[in-house]
């Protein structure tokens, strides 16, 4: 949870990589995560998250396209990694019906399953969703922390105050 533009999706992908990649993984596994094509990684990033993104209603299964919703993905066992991870970005756009469809997976996740829900407005989620999640609040860095990071990267001749506020 946090304001727009703080890197929540980047953080979610980093956490996902740590959960899916191990010492036996190869560069192809890393590339598959980066391109959102890893078989144990489901990345939902729509402008509006609708009920069919979470679960299919009866007679809505598409044999050609196969697995296209979060709940069906979560019900499967991992195929190449020890864990499986579903990331739902823009969760603040889910209506109550979509959130309720996700509840079962949050209440009783299968083993080695992680669900990362990204929102710009956590108050838009149902209390039942919020209460079943571990919340990580992503806050903007202050100037001192940004300068320390710049120095750690070997950029000591630049100060964060050298940039206009819209760039930081």
Describe every region a protein language model picked out.
Residues 42, 86, 116, 134-136:
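Hydrophobic/aromatic beta-strand patches that form the interior of the parallel beta-sheet core
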Residues 72, 104, 148-152:
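CheY-like receiver
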Residues 65, 97, 101, 120, ...:
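Short, well-structured alpha-helical interface segments that form or flank functional binding sites
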Residues 89-91, 117-122:
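A short beta-strand-to-loop transition that corresponds to the Sensor-1 phosphate-sensing loop
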Residues 74-75, 98-117:
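Conserved catalytic/switch belt of AAA+ P-loop NTPases
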Residues 1-34, 111-113, 121-168:
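Charged, glycine-rich active-site and insertion segments that engage polyanionic ligands
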Residues 39, 78, 109-110, 141:
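Proline-centered helix-kink/hinge sites
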């Amino acid at each position: 949870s946090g304001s727009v533009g703080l890197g929540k999706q980047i953080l979610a992908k980093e956490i996902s990589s740590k959960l899916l990649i191990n010492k036996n993984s190869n560069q192809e596994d890393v590339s598959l995560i980066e391109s959102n094509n890893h078989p144990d990684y489901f990345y939902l990033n729509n402008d509006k998250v609708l009920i069919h993104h979470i679960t299919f209603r009866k007679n809505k299964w598409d044999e050609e396209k196969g697995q296209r919703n979060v709940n069906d993905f979560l019900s499967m066992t991992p195929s190449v990694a020890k864990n499986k991870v579903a990331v739902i970005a823009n969760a603040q756009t889910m209506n109550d019906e979509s959130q309720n469809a996700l509840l079962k997976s949050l209440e009783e996740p299968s083993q080695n399953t992680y669900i990362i829900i990204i929102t710009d407005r956590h108050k838009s989620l149902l209390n039942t969703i919020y209460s079943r999640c571990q919340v990580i609040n992503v806050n903007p860095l202050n100037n001192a922390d940004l300068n320390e990071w710049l120095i750690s990267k070997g950029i000591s001749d630049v100060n964060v105050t050298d940039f206009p506020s819209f760039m930081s």
